[in-house]
Regions:
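Extracellular ligand-binding/catalytic regions of CAZymes and related secreted enzymes
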Residues: 1-34, 69-74, 112, 204-294
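Helical hinge/lid and interdomain linker segments adjacent to catalytic or ligand-binding clefts
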Residues: 6-121
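A glycine-rich, often tryptophan-bearing local segment used as a flexible ligand/cofactor-contacting loop or short
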Residues: 10, 80-179
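Histidine (H) residue identity feature
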Residues: 15, 21, 31, 108, ...
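Surface-exposed intrinsically disordered loops and tails
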Residues: 21, 45-64, 113, 117-143, ...
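Residue-identity detector for glycine
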Residues: 23, 40, 57, 81-83, ...
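Arginine residue identity/basic-tract feature
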Residues: 24, 33, 49-51, 94-98, ...
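Catalytic beta-strand/loop cores that center a nucleophilic Ser/Cys/Thr
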Residues: 58, 132-241
Length: 294
């Protein structure tokens, strides 16, 4: 039997029913578990987990992730800025330094800004109060409908709809037939990601376009393997502008959302479910790519 890669799907909040807890990523987990090799053997052993906190304020798994058997961490930063302790970030950083693959994603404004202290991939995430986008002209609202959410808040469409994207030819962006993916789930206020200065191994592989301003913005930044100054071969990594590309509500709005979500959902995926294939191809590509780095 093949050796399954072990994937940890992890949020940065304790389980809270009326929030983006890990149970709201069940369609993603189901899809990853359905992927198999040519002999029909499952490729991935998937664990889905919300943050757990000891009295000291650390998460016992994340703070020692480098000592675990996991091969990949898919980290959904759904916190308001305090979702990862310094010890958690250190454990995750060591995990990548020992070759672990990381997919990191967040959302608008400062949502998920605990990612800033992650080594390497954390520098690709831009927020409102800290680690802002390098271009000052982008320090302004893009989405002008949901007025209680400040920048970065790129409007790519309604939850439940899809956005048409631009991609480069990359292992992450290819369909099984060799053509390139064209669609990802839309969101009214995506966050901001970019290539950190002097990081040659990073590239923007998918770009969206705001439906309100027409501005292009990065959706996916891919980090190839790299050797750090201490000789560690760091695993591959991905920085995404919004966890809404992967959450159940954006794949199927009939699954529901927390009560604080104000915007009415769209129905494009319900009417044209075949468009959802592209994000599923991306997910399969990401799992394979993060596993394969060497």
């Amino acid at each position: 039997m093949n050796k399954q890669a072990k994937i940890l799907l992890q949020t940065t909040i304790p389980h809270t029913e009326d929030d983006w807890h890990v149970g709201r990523f069940s369609l993603l987990a189901e899809h990853l578990r359905s992927l198999s090799d040519e002999a029909g053997n499952p490729l991935y052993d998937v664990t889905a987990r919300d943050r757990e906190e000891e009295p000291s304020g650390i998460d016992p798994l994340l703070s020692a992730l480098d000592e675990s058997e996991f091969d990949q961490l898919w980290l959904f930063a759904v916190d308001a800025g305090d979702g990862l302790s310094p010890a958690d970030c250190a454990g995750i950083t060591r995990f990548r330094k020992r070759g672990g693959g990381i997919l990191s994603t967040r959302d608008h404004n400062d949502l998920g800004s605990s990612l800033c202290t992650l080594g390497g991939v954390g520098a690709a995430h831009y927020f409102h109060s800290k680690q802002q986008e390098p271009d000052p002209s982008r320090h302004s609202r893009d989405d002008n409908v949901t007025l209680n959410i400040d920048w970065p808040n790129y409007h790519s469409g309604a939850n439940g709809d899809f956005q048409t994207i631009k991609v480069i030819d990359h292992e992450l962006t290819r369909r099984p037939n060799g053509t390139l993916i064209e669609y990802l789930p839309a969101h009214p206020h995506e966050g901001a990601v970019g290539i950190p200065p002097s990081v040659e191994e990073a590239s923007a592989v998918a770009i969206g376009t705001s439906k309100t301003t027409g501005r292009p913005f990065n959706l996916i930044i891919a980090f190839e393997n790299s050797v750090d100054p201490y000789g560690n071969l760091c695993g591959r990594a991905i920085a995404e502008s919004s966890f809404h590309h992967l959450v159940d509500y954006n794949w199927n709005p009939e699954t529901g959302c927390p009560t604080f979500v104000e915007e009415a959902p769209g129905d494009e995926y319900i009417r044209t479910p075949e468009k959802l294939d592209d994000v599923k191809h991306y997910v399969a590509n990401a799992a394979a790519w993060l596993t394969r780095g060497d």
